[in-house]
Swiss-Prot record:
The active site is at 653 (nucleophile), 692. Residues 972-1012 are annotated as: Disordered. Residues 1003-1012 are annotated as: Interaction with VP1 protein. One of its GO terms (molecular function) is structural molecule activity. One of its GO terms (biological process) is proteolysis. SUPFAM superfamilies: Positive stranded ssRNA viruses. Keywords: Capsid protein, Host cytoplasm, Hydrolase, Metal-binding, Protease, Serine protease, T=13 icosahedral capsid protein, Virion. PROSITE patterns: BIRNAVIRUS_VP4_PRO. This is Structural polyprotein.
Length: 1012
């Protein structure tokens, strides 16, 4: 198929930027003419998950400024605590004065884990609420999911690792530029003072009033006690002002003073900013005391989203003491003006992304891009080139019509990130006015987008003088579609104003209007030469870069695929592919490629069908001549003809399309390809349906034929579906499957063992088929070979197997593959096919069945560990999870079945307590007090050792405790009278006794007694 996509795209940049903000900014094609610059600003934040593992991210997808959203963490008390604001990378008010938001997308996901955590847990729930933040009252999971009934504005239970994407879609058009609250020159002021210019466009005003004759009466209020007079929910992100008056009357005590304060409160209940209305204001008895006020709050003071306000008063007696009784009555009004707060998208809608059950300390990443139209300040304008936006009402109308049907077109505000990535190709088709809408056709959106294109493009032709001839030629269609809304009294199309009324029109009746075939290409209108020939529209220039290609209207044409083969011999196909053909009424050889011209076949009624091989007579009776032409592509209402050197076709695949064309003569575009053989007025199936179905899907069409047909998806289908994400089972039934009023000779049936209806039937081929049938009946091996061939053909892998055979002439690779192929009933095959059997895909379990199986697996595992209370029913009540550590500790200590979803933190973090035995304590005391053989330790020392064991919950003493015990033992030994006596110490200076001398063996030693 000829690929002209690079030369034929007509992109609408605005809608492309809306649906895919990462492609960059684009000027809004309305009639707001201000010189501006386009800029993309990124936002990247790594948010730390709190202790509870839950939090809330509030996005303002349409806010025209640096504010993107805010992050709140859920506290254990159940309330939210403000963490930080989410802004663009650059602070826009520093360099720019005005801005308009073009598009914005943000992604929330987590891919990091804190220390000690080895699994990425947690889910994300997201909802776009068509209201303000203060109007939400329930922030739980059920509360968020019930905030809207639109299925395209909420998603739930998305894994935190996959993430969600928030897409900003406009809620209004024709919006003016918004002042950013930028600093302005302040001549003559102190340099420390800061003057800013905030937006005053489209203010949101909150007025707090009481019913008639209502007065707030304070009877004997103690002095110094705060009294709340007014409370109200408000929403503010930008500068605000508050004004009003209070009237104090019936003051019965002299020297009364009052303090009046206004508090602006954030989403988490904390005070964002406080304004003092009056301080030490004296009240006079016997009169009405008026307290007027008018205060302002700049954007810089609003550090988090404001959702409510309250007014409080404190009265006290001058010179008195706290607690003195005071009596007064007050009435009044209050008005809060949020500047720019009523700008569409500034405060509503809001998108809330809640994450839960994420590991504490994990990081949730928020990343995205915001595209703006910006008007720089005078300093930056000196070095920055600005340009006017391109006024394109056709693109604006197309964008409005697409987004007005976004629910039917599957365009959401919140997406699972993976799904949003898959839809990018579909968004590119929506943004390209010349795309054939193949992916949209697979999703079922093609008819809606085609109708929108028809109504959006003709409006443009009424805007420019060069389009006058086409406007007159197309007047019937425009008047039918738009009626009185096509032109205003001035003669200018209402679409030029860009107002919402340009998006009106009878879209659902659009398909009934006659398409004149004129196309608009880059605001250049081309009238084809001799566009109407024999009732067939032939336009030589529908697309840029395709002016030399012939195009015809699908109105009055039927389509059918033909399998084309190249043969080494008459029975062995070498290559197999398919080509789409169209049947056109009349003799139109000028539209055929040169290889087909001059070739025709006659029908039973004598008419000609050009493009067929002249082989006998076509078994049909027709009332006129027809031409069969090959085609390369199919667009909304036109088909592009092919000039490839394709030979004349043979076979009976086109007979059904010719008969359908001759009998019914359709006058509406046919958006389906036909295939089937005629046999005695009955339509029968033909072969190679897998190949033909793939050809139809490549052109974004369905294939219709006799009966339902189920496709065996093989490797070819896996590759094809990866490139073209369509449903491979798109086999439709024709509205008329039986043509009873065709003559009995209108068709014939081919009985070919090869099931190749496109092979030319010759006597030699018929003899070969008969011989093959006889051989199959006589030889079971040959019959098996025919069955293998039919299996290859039915699954569309004949060409793949032929190419594989060329690369494996000795079949070594095939033998190894078959030897190592999985066997039926093996573990891998049971895991893949279940109990359905080898080669039969088992039905996957439903979510409920999968959950029950998971509960049973967890329960069985717990039973093997001796945890018998974790039955499948208990696991289901516990959130389909096994027992937590707290539940296990509770069961081990109490032997009672823990409550599901109860964590029992006291049992998880409690200190382990075990008592040491008396023998263990005595042995330790003896070892510490002295060596074996010494005196037993006293009872006081044994008690000291026991106290150490008790302090350590049964554990042995640590080093410090051991030192203390040794010192205690030494002290006790010195003062203990029952201690063992010390060993005598030798005298260091005493002389040793002289040993007797040796006198001989026979001489006795003379003693002192002998001397006496």
């Amino acid at each position: 198929m000829t690929n002209l996509m690079d030369h034929t795209q007509q992109i609408v940049p605005f809608i492309r930027s809306l649906l895919m903000p990462t492609t960059g900014p684009a000027s809004i094609p309305d009639d707001t003419l201000e010189k501006h610059t386009l800029r993309s600003e990124t936002s990247t934040y790594n948010l730390t998950v709190g202790d509870t593992g839950s939090g809330l991210i509030v996005f303002f997808p349409g806010f025209p400024g640096s504010v993107v959203g805010a992050h709140y963490t859920l506290q254990s008390s159940g309330s939210y605590q403000f963490d930080q604001m989410l802004l663009t990378a650059q602070n826009l008010p520093v360099s720019y004065n005005y801005c308009r938001l073009v598009s914005r997308s943000l992604t929330v996901r987590s891919s990091t884990l804190p220390g000690g955590v080895y699994a990425l847990n947690g889910t994300i729930n997201a909802v776009t609420f068509q209201g303000s933040l203060s109007e939400l009252t329930d922030y739980s999971y059920n509360g968020l999911m019930s905030a809207t009934a639109n299925i395209n504005d909420k998603i739930g239970n998305v894994l935190v690792g996959e993430g969600v994407t928030v897409l900003s879609l406009p809620t209004s058009y024709d919006l003016s530029y918004v002042r950013l609250g930028d600093p302005i020159p302040a001549a003559g002021l102190d340099p420390k003072l800061m003057a800013t210019c905030d937006s005053s466009d489209r203010p949101r005003v909150y007025t707090v009033t009481a019913a008639d004759e209502y007065q707030f009466s304070s009877q004997l209020i103690p002095s110094g006690v705060k009294t709340t007079l007014f409370t109200a929910n408000i929403d503010a992100l930008t500068s605000l002002s508050v004004g009003g008056e209070l009237i104090f009357s019936q003051v019965t005590i002299h020297s009364i003073e009052v303090d009046v304060t206004i508090y602006f409160i954030g989403f988490d209940g904390t005070e964002v900013t406080v304004k003092a209305v009056a301080t030490d204001f004296g009240l006079t008895t016997g009169t009405n005391n008026l307290v007027p006020f008018n205060l302002g709050g700049p954007t810089s003071e609003i550090t988090q989203p404001i959702t409510s306000m309250k007014l409080e008063v404190v009265t006290y007696k001058r010179g008195g003491t706290a607690g003195d009784p005071i009596s007064w009555t007050v009435s009044g009004t209050l008005a809060v003006t949020v500047h720019g707060g009523n700008y569409p998208g500034a405060l509503r809608p809001v998108t809330l992304v809640a994450y839960e059950r994420v590991a504490a300390g994990s990081v949730v990443t928020v990343a995205g891009v915001s595209n703006f139209e910006l008007i720089p300040n005078p300093e930056l304008a000196k070095n920055l080139v600005t340009e006017y936006g391109r006024f394109d009402p056709g693109a604006m109308n197309y964008t409005k019509l697409i987004l007005s049907e976004r629910d039917r077109l599957g365009i959401k505000t919140v997406w699972p990130t993976r799904e949003y990535t898959d839809f990018r190709e579909y968004f590119m088709e929506v943004a390209d006015l010349n795309s054939p809408l193949k992916i949209a056709g697979a999703f079922g959106f093609k008819d809606i987008i085609r109708a929108i294109r028809k109504i959006a493009v003709p409006v443009v032709s009424t805007l420019f003088p060069p389009a006058a001839p086409l406007a007159h030629a197309n007047r019937e269609g425009v008047d039918y579609l738009l009626g009185d809304e096509a032109q205003a009294a001035s003669g200018t199309a209402r679409g030029a104003s860009g107002k919402a009324r340009a998006a009106s029109g009878r879209i659902r009746q659009l398909t009934l209007a006659a398409d004149k075939g004129y196309e608009v290409v880059a605001n250049m209108f081309q009238v084809p030469q001799n566009p109407i020939v024999d009732g067939i529209l032939a336009s030589p220039g529908i697309l840029r870069g395709a002016h030399n290609l012939d195009c015809v209207s699908k109105e009055g044409a039927t389509l059918f695929p033909v399998v084309i083969t190249t043969l080494e011999d008459e029975l062995t196909p070498k290559a197999l592919n398919s080509k789409m053909f169209a049947v056109i009424e009349g003799a139109r050889e000028d539209l055929q490629p040169p290889s087909q011209r001059g070739s025709f076949i006659r029908t039973l009624s004598g008419h000609r069908v050009y493009g067929y091989a002249p082989d006998g007579v076509l078994p049909l009776e027709t009332g006129r001549d027809y031409t069969v032409v090959p085609i390369d592509d199919v667009w909304d209402d036109s088909i592009m003809l092919s000039q490839d050197p394709i030979p004349p076709i043979v076979g009976n695949s086109g007979n059904l399309a010719i008969a359908y064309m001759d009998v019914f003569r359709p006058k509406v575009p046919i958006h389906v390809a036909m295939t089937g053989a005629l046999n005695a007025s009955e339509i029968e199936s033909v072969s190679f349906r897998s190949t033909k179905l793939a050809t139809a899907h490549r052109l974004g069409m369905k294939l219709a034929g006799p009966g339902d047909y189920d496709i065996n998806t093989g490797p070819n289908w896996a590759t094809f579906i990866k490139r073209f994400p369509h449903n491979p089972r798109g086999w439709d039934r024709l509205p008329y499957l039986n043509l009873p009023y065709l003559p009995p000779t209108a068709g014939r049936q081919f009985h070919l063992a090869l099931a190749a209806s496109e092979f030319k039937e010759t006597p030699e081929l018929e003899d070969a088929v008969r011989a093959m049938d006889a051989a199959a009946n006589a030889d079971p091996l040959f019959r098996s070979a025919l069955q293998v061939f039919m299996w290859l053909e039915e699954n569309g892998i004949v060409t793949d197997m032929a190419n594989f055979a060329l690369s494996d002439p000795n079949a070594h690779r095939m033998k190894n593959f078959l030897a190592n192929a999985p066997q039926a009933g093996s573990k891998s095959q049971r895991a893949k096919y279940g109990t359905a059997g080898y080669g039969v895909e088992a039905r996957g379990p439903t979510p409920e069945e999968a959950q029950r199986a998971k509960d049973a697996r967890i329960s069985k595992k717990m039973e093997t560990m001796g945890i018998y209370f974790a039955t499948p029913e208990w696991v289901a009540l516990n959130g389909h999870r096994g027992p937590s550590p707290g539940q296990l500790k509770y069961w081990q200590n109490t032997r009672e079945i823990p409550e599901p979803n109860e964590d029992y933190p006291d049992y998880v973090h409690a200190e382990k307590s075990r008592l040491a035995s008396e023998e263990q304590i005595l042995r330790a005391a003896t070892s510490i007090y002295g060596a074996p053989g010494q005196a037993e330790p006293p009872q006081a020392f044994i008690d000291e050792v026991a106290r150490v064991y008790e302090t350590n919950h049964g554990r042995v003493p640590n080093q410090e405790q051991m030192k203390d015990l040794l010192l205690t033992a030494m002290e006790m030994k010195h003062r203990n009278p029952r201690r063992a006596p010390p060993k005598p110490k030798p005298k260091p200076n005493a002389p040793s006794q002289r040993p007797p001398g040796r006198l001989g063996r026979w001489i006795r030693t003379v003693s002192d007694e002998d001397l006496e």
